[in-house]
């Protein structure tokens, strides 16, 4: 058991090192995409499943409340939090549409969809991205593995942050770190002189 614990930490550290080498440009582009959308009076819609849903909620909460700095609230909506909406859509046998319907209802040109999917193949996330494209939204995608179907849907204005790993737990850990990094970059860019 002790050896397994060490392996978990070692794998996580190795993934962080690989990501630190591979992802700064993509994370910077994503942060600036989010900042420009907010500065233009737009909002960020976020979605994911399971742990990715938790990461989406964490991002939205950090925008609406605060991350590490006291500042005005920023408009972000986690699409996975309204159980009535989710179950109403799913009850009509539209499981794949639980996020896409919300994107079509709430998304506008200039908004950003933050789509989080470990493998990039979750049907409801893929459909949400397709809906965002029809609404002229920009997509920031957090993925892993080979990026899955999601990676193939992204255009030149979109940003994929693909964690360099084929291990779901490590990808999800890095998604949380990436979300925290994005929140910090947004705060530092929009409110550079705010005190903690």
Swiss-Prot record:
Pfam families membership: SIS_2
Disulphide connectivity of cysteines: none
SUPFAM superfamilies: SIS domain (SSF53697)
Annotated ranges, domain SIS: 34-196
An annotated GO BP: carbohydrate derivative metabolic process
GO MF annotation, one: carbohydrate derivative binding
Record InterPro entries: DiaA (IPR023070), GmhA/DiaA (IPR035461), SIS_dom (IPR001347), SIS_dom_sf (IPR046348), SIS_GmhA/DiaA_subfam (IPR050099)
Keyword terms: DNA replication
UniProt family annotation: Belongs to the SIS family. DiaA subfamily.
Binding partners and assembly: Homotetramer; dimer of dimers.
PANTHER family xref list: DNAA INITIATOR-ASSOCIATING PROTEIN DIAA (PTHR30390:SF6), SEDOHEPTULOSE 7-PHOSPHATE ISOMERASE / DNAA INITIATOR-ASSOCIATING FACTOR FOR REPLICATION INITIATION (PTHR30390)
Stated role: Required for the timely initiation of chromosomal replication via direct interactions with the DnaA initiator protein.
HAMAP family registered for this protein in UniProt: SIS_DiaA
Listed name of the protein: DnaA initiator-associating protein DiaA
Originating organism: Salmonella typhi
Higher taxonomy: Bacteria, Pseudomonadati, Pseudomonadota, Gammaproteobacteria, Enterobacterales
């Amino acid at each position: 058991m002790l050896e397994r614990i060490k392996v978990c930490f070692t794998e996580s550290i190795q993934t962080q090192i690989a990501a630190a080498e591979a992802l700064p440009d993509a994370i910077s582009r994503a942060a600036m995409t989010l900042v420009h959308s907010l500065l233009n009076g737009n909002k960020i819609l976020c979605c994911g499943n399971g742990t990715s849903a938790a990461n989406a909620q964490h991002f939205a909460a950090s925008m609406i409340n605060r991350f590490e700095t006291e500042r005005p609230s920023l408009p972000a909506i986690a699409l996975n939090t309204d159980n009535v909406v989710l179950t109403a859509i799913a009850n009509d046998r539209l499981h794949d549409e639980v996020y896409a319907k919300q994107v079509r209802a709430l998304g506008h040109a200039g908004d950003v969809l933050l789509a989080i999917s470990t493998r990039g193949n979750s049907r409801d996330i893929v459909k949400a991205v397709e809906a965002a494209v029809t609404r002229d939204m920009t997509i920031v995608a957090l993925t892993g593995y080979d990026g899955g179907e999601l990676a193939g849907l992204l255009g030149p204005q979109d940003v994929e942050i693909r964690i360099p790993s084929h291990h779901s737990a490590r990808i999800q850990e890095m998604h949380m770190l990436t979300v925290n990094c994005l929140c910090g970059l947004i705060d530092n860019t929009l409110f550079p002189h705010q005190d903690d």
